[in-house]
Amino acid sequence: MALKTATSGMWMTDDCKKSFMEMKWKKVHRYVVYKLEEKSRKVTVDKVGAAGESYDDLAASLPEDDCRYAVFDFDYVTVDNCRMSKIFFITWSPEASRIREKMMYATSKSGLRRVLDGVHYELQATDPTEMGFDKIQDRAK
């Protein structure tokens, strides 16, 4: 059963939430990348990163000229030596992508965010410098 997202009329496939929950609870994935399928009007899983993959692997997997959503499970150790985990929701909207695509991603974002319960921080980026690893570290701590 697919879930409808907000005003865009896009449907989110069951695999979208399943992959997110596997990342959040089972730690099977380090990240999940989502893609909008314009013709079928669905949000689908584009790629999942194995537990051993890094933030750099996620950044490298994002296309230079197409928009994507991504969730990333950031693990870190606090100054008190406590292990922590924060989930980031990233909207990737590169300047080279089509205007129509940017608008579709913008209008679908809130619906997808509501379904992906447990996200701690949001990040929007139009080029790689706006989503560098240092930005993730600064936001999480």
Swiss-Prot record:
This protein's UniProt keywords: Actin-binding, Cytoplasm, Cytoskeleton, Phosphoprotein
Subcellular location(s) of the protein: Cytoplasm, Cytoskeleton
A Pfam family of this chain: Cofilin_ADF
Domain spans labelled ADF-H: 8-141
Reported consequences of knocking out the gene: Developmental defects, reduced plant size, early flowering and decreased number of inflorescence secondary branches.
Main localization (coarse): cytoplasm
GO cellular component: actin cytoskeleton; cytoplasm
Swiss-Prot/TrEMBL GO biological process terms: actin filament bundle assembly; actin filament depolymerization; actin filament polymerization
Family (UniProt): Belongs to the actin-binding proteins ADF family.
UniProt name for this protein: Actin-depolymerizing factor 9
Lineage: Eukaryota, Viridiplantae, Streptophyta, Embryophyta, Tracheophyta
Gene: ADF9
